[in-house]
């Protein structure tokens, strides 16, 4: 038995924090091309900050074809809906398949983690979070602030979205401990968390 499992990130294939409305076949090809390359080197795929049930379904089925389980990372807005307008429960009930090993709220503020946990608990699946520390609760899609051409330097997200300075490593620990006490078994940090935050919560395992 391994003490450490390696996750392979399958992120949103068009833009971050935004539903991908492209043709399903195009999305599937993008996911498959990436998954095929990294698949041999990972234990499972992490569906990394996905904004609609359709994308989750496509990526889950790609992983199934490659015989890999998936940790599903749903991005949520302040209203606890995905950017597509779907609820967590709707996506779970419609698209869950046998290779889902867990469900997390992905790249969301600690406040959104807390407000969405009551719905996730009811789904009877291992759950948790990867919390961000952006300066705003609802980060905007990258393409809205980064319009650089391939030969230009793009806008730094730290400048466009800002960074919270009110969540110390100790506060991140306290927040994570509270979520763990509510049943979460998957704890992590996302954008703008740093090694100090992760070191602090590592004692919660």
Protein language model features and the residues they cover:
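Domain-level signal for soluble alpha/beta catalytic cores
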Residues: 1-205
């Amino acid at each position: 038995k391994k003490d450490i499992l390696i996750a392979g990130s399958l992120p949103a294939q068009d833009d971050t924090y935004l539903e991908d409305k492209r043709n399903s076949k195009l999305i599937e090809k993008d996911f498959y091309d990436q998954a095929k390359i990294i698949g041999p080197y990972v234990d499972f795929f992490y569906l990394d900050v996905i904004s609609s049930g359709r994308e989750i379904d496509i990526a889950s089925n790609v992983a199934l074809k490659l015989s890999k389980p998936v940790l599903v990372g749903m991005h949520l807005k302040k209203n606890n809906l995905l950017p597509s307008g779907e609820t967590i429960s709707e996506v779970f009930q419609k698209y869950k398949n046998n290779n889902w090993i867990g469900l997390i709220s992905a790249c969301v503020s600690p406040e959104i983690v807390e407000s969405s946990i009551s719905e996730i608990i009811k789904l009877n699946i291992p759950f948790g979070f990867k919390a961000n520390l952006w300066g705003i609760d609802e980060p905007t899609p990258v393409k809205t602030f980064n319009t650089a051409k391939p030969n230009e330097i793009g806008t730094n997200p730290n400048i466009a979205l800002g960074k919270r300075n009110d969540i110390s490593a100790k506060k991140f620990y306290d927040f994570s401990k509270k979520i763990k006490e509510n049943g979460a078994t998957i704890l992590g940090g996302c954008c703008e968390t740093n090694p100090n935050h992760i070191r602090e919560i590592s004692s919660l395992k």
